[in-house]
A protein has these predicted regions:
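Solvent-exposed, well-ordered loop and adjacent helix/strand elements within mature globular domains
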Residues: 7-11, 17-205
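Sec-dependent N-terminal signal peptides of Gram-positive bacterial secreted proteins and lipoproteins
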Residues: 1-4
Length: 205
């Protein structure tokens, strides 16, 4: 009887140790399973090329809503100050963007631009500007031009004769670009008209 009494506690401790080890393994397995499941559910982000997209051709001229005259589009790309964009989704997009070395606001390695309502885009939407020389400028919509400031097709800002305004940080913008108000001065290859705007069905979140 004394021997049996001595063996009982040892057996009980052994069982407790085994149960603890099994529980620990179960927790580890459960954790791994949950992590893997989340990874599968989230999945890798699909390439931009796989998103639906709409292409808009840009004409070489437009009619001024003020004078009624036909104005040629020479390819100008003006600038807009980011600090003045503080409203709604556009304000949020500008608040999380940062200027590059020339003072151009960028987000996700894309330039913030303001465009007219013709393109049916919203702040944060991905788009490409295709230039006449084949250069592609990767952009994200950072602001919407007011219809009152654009032509009847809501493509061009009739006062500046441009279809794309690059959003800049006026504290760090390159001096020559700021003084002339011409974003095309950033790169020699940008000095060409925009002939097409491609809007992707993807919005920065």
């Amino acid at each position: 009887m004394p021997v049996e009494a001595a063996d009982a506690p040892i057996t009980e401790e052994t069982k407790t140790f085994e149960n603890t080890a099994m529980l620990s393994e179960l927790v580890e397995c459960t954790t791994v399973t949950i992590v893997e499941e989340c990874a599968v559910l989230a999945g890798p982000e699909k390439p931009l090329e796989e998103y639906e997209k709409t292409a808009y051709d840009i004409p070489s001229s437009f009619v001024s809503p003020v004078s009624g005259k036909t104005i040629s589009y020479k390819g100008g790309k003006t600038i807009e100050r980011s600090r003045k964009i503080t409203y709604g989704k556009a304000g949020y997009i500008n608040s999380i963007a940062s200027p590059d070395s020339d003072g151009f606001m960028k987000l996700d390695d894309r330039y913030l631009v303001a465009v007219g309502s013709r393109f049916n885009a919203q702040p944060g939407q991905y788009m490409d500007l295709i230039l006449q020389n084949g250069v592609v400028i990767k952009c994200i919509m950072g602001d919407l031009k007011a219809d009152i400031d654009t032509d009847t097709t809501n493509t061009f800002t009739y006062r500046s004769c441009c279809c794309s305004e690059f959003i800049i940080d006026d504290k760090t913008i390159r001096k020559d670009i700021y003084e002339r108000g011409n974003a095309s001065l950033k790169y020699f290859s940008w000095d060409a008209p925009v002939v097409r705007v491609v809007v992707y069905d993807k919005v920065y979140c």
